[in-house]
Amino acid sequence: MKTLLLTLVVVTIVCLDLGYSLTCLNCPEQYCKRIHTCRNGENVCFKRFYEGKLLCKQFRRGCAATCPEAKSREIVQCCSTDECNH
């Protein structure tokens, strides 16, 4: 009986994803390769871009607790899986 209980405890611990943290791309460039581990409570990756001067697109990527609101002339895309904000 003790063996069965111990086996169930081990299986439960292995199956639970304890301490999981989302990873998002985090950089201001269009072609981003920098991976960042999000803090506890940041469950969303975002990509924000807008047209700057001379029609140059400016990018920002990172982690957030909720999807940021788009400001004037901005597009914001959000997702919730690892490195999904490419």
UniProtKB/Swiss-Prot annotation:
<keyword id="KW-0732">Signal</keyword>
<dbReference type="InterPro" id="IPR045860">
    <property type="entry name" value="Snake_toxin-like_sf"/>
</dbReference>
<dbReference type="GO" id="GO:0090729">
    <property type="term" value="F:toxin activity"/>
</dbReference>
<keyword id="KW-0528">Neurotoxin</keyword>
<dbReference type="GO" id="GO:0030550">
    <property type="term" value="F:acetylcholine receptor inhibitor activity"/>
</dbReference>
<dbReference type="InterPro" id="IPR018354">
    <property type="entry name" value="Snake_toxin_con_site"/>
</dbReference>
<comment type="function">
    <text>Binds with low affinity to muscular (alpha-1-beta-1-delta-epsilon/CHRNA1-CHRNB1-CHRND-CHRNE) and very low affinity to neuronal (alpha-7/CHRNA7) nicotinic acetylcholine receptor (nAChR).</text>
</comment>
<keyword id="KW-0964">Secreted</keyword>
<keyword id="KW-0629">Postsynaptic neurotoxin</keyword>
<feature type="disulfide bond">
    <location>
        <begin position="79"/>
        <end position="84"/>
    </location>
</feature>
<feature type="disulfide bond">
    <location>
        <begin position="24"/>
        <end position="45"/>
    </location>
</feature>
<dbReference type="GO" id="GO:0099106">
    <property type="term" value="F:ion channel regulator activity"/>
</dbReference>
<keyword id="KW-0800">Toxin</keyword>
<dbReference type="InterPro" id="IPR054131">
    <property type="entry name" value="Toxin_cobra-type"/>
</dbReference>
<keyword id="KW-0872">Ion channel impairing toxin</keyword>
<comment type="similarity">
    <text>Belongs to the three-finger toxin family. Ancestral subfamily. Orphan group II sub-subfamily.</text>
</comment>
<feature type="disulfide bond">
    <location>
        <begin position="38"/>
        <end position="63"/>
    </location>
</feature>
<feature type="disulfide bond">
    <location>
        <begin position="67"/>
        <end position="78"/>
    </location>
</feature>
<feature type="signal peptide">
    <location>
        <begin position="1"/>
        <end position="21"/>
    </location>
</feature>
<dbReference type="InterPro" id="IPR003571">
    <property type="entry name" value="Snake_3FTx"/>
</dbReference>
<feature type="disulfide bond">
    <location>
        <begin position="27"/>
        <end position="32"/>
    </location>
</feature>
<protein>
    <recommendedName>
        <fullName>Weak neurotoxin WNTX34</fullName>
    </recommendedName>
</protein>
<dbReference type="Pfam" id="PF21947">
    <property type="entry name" value="Toxin_cobra-type"/>
</dbReference>
<keyword id="KW-1015">Disulfide bond</keyword>
<keyword id="KW-0008">Acetylcholine receptor inhibiting toxin</keyword>
<dbReference type="GO" id="GO:0005576">
    <property type="term" value="C:extracellular region"/>
</dbReference>
